[in-house]
Amino acid sequence: MTLEHGHTPAEIAARLDQQSGSGRLRDAIFGGIDGTVTTFAIVAGVQGAGLSAGIVVALGMANVLADGFSMAAGNYAGTKAVADDRRRLWDVEERHIRENRQGELDELDQILARKGLRGQVQREARKMISADKDQWISLMLTEEYGLPPVDARPIRAAIVIFAAFVAAGLLPLLPYLIGLAPAFSWSIAISGLTFFGIGAIKSRWTLIPWWRSGIETLLIGGLAASLAFAVGRLFHP
């Protein structure tokens, strides 16, 4: 059986160094799915209402830019809140180590005990961890407060989600922008491939097969577009 990844020292080091990128990958996938779903839903709704291609482009572009910015701003605010909380708790733990070192060592003992360390091994681990204050505090933030082990970068997260939203959100509009006919049929095909592709990529971080993840994402996008199209038909002249 082929293992999912290698275990040479270089491969292990590279994999550990990449942990901080998982959040950006999540943001890119989330932004890509939402960008495609919302834009194609607008295309389907306007098409269902029987309105012109110009209105499709105008409303679609407005959604891509405005909703993309809104998502990026919301992501920035949420990520910044986590980063600010991490910095606040870092200062708290640093002060506690300075003013009540034994109490913090007792906390570290309990954390290590919950991980199964006992006796001499536990004492050696405590000694080594507490010798590096930054690593000690980082461990406490993760184990005591449940914060991620790496510091969040709000601006980078916002840029990633905005770029993914815009890039994926423009795809359903592409046939209208370059004059492909019939534009709506092309938009359906392009959006369907985008939904499936993003879902297939997402499967790398799930336990389900790539084709199933692709189909699930395709069905979600298709359902949203169908609802929008049905609402649009209600207002068809």
PLM regions and their residue ranges:
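Internal alpha-helical transmembrane segments
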Residues: 2-78
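Interfacial loop-to-transmembrane junctions
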Residues: 197-222
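Core segments of transmembrane alpha-helices
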Residues: 35-40, 161-172
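Cytosol/matrix-facing amphipathic helices and coiled-coil assembly/linker segments
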Residues: 2-27, 79-161
